[in-house]
């Protein structure tokens, strides 16, 4: 499929699911949201970071078209794929980078950026490997886009890679969009490119291979029986990766009230044990410790105040409770952005503690609510 900048812009006119990014003479078109209606035409499936020259309107860098997980889309339903033979390439858990020659220099881009730390790392790896840099330039000068996956311990998502590398995952013709890696595999290896591991098999065989595997994302399955508008590509992910990626995404994005709720429901250990990314685990563990320390301080204050409950006037108890809250606020001043915990909750917890009732559960629920409504808020 031949694409020009004019055709791409016309395709997404007035469509909030897509955005246009510009840098000097470069124009990048990519989707904002991955929703079912986003990719309702073949042309829209090409708009995943495709990059054009604003001067000529021609494609200068063409990453993958949008393809789907097994069972995610009518074209990837298992019944439809049954018995088909696929080239199975190892699916890597990194960052896709695609290059272009800009003002005589080979530059890398991600799907939605012209510059970010992953791009800097990828360009550094290219500079350190002269053979790879020259091979990349040769393909670009032929009107082809080598598509790389950057793997690096520095940018770990789920799988803990020990080395940092640029792996060539495909090569596309900028004009036609044809995929060329499989037919040019031997030549590409001789040029100095490293390719993902490969085997041939059915979807059923691929699923069996990764059924019990750990630290494996899965396969990109490719079938070239049809080529227009695209060959059939399918993402097949391991059960382990689905679980680990869910846990990673959940923990990475979890707000403080839900993080604290994991603790209240004794689920924190299960989630943390599944996440393989040490940076995310450390950050969220540190945050959860602050939340639980605040909670334990509230419990201690309630127990202390319970000794006064029934012996002093309500106003006096409330004043003492206010002092306890101020003390907690001072104790955690480096961590707290806001601490408006209602004094009534603390006096009620003191009453429950005095009566040997579940004041701990009561305070946990109230702190969860305060975090949810952001009357108690940690610094970022």
From Swiss-Prot:
It comes from Thermovibrio ammonificans (strain DSM 15698 / JCM 12110 / HB-1). It is an enzyme of class 6 (ligase). Putative RNA ligase. Is able to catalyze the adenylation reaction of ssDNA 3'-terminal phosphate (ssDNA 3'p) to 3'-adenylated DNA (ssDNA 3'pp5'A). Keywords: Ligase. InterPro entries: T4-Rnl1-like_N. Pfam families: RNA_lig_T4_1. Its EC number is 6.5.1.-. One of its GO terms (molecular function) is ligase activity. This is Putative RNA ligase. The keyword Transmembrane helix does not apply.
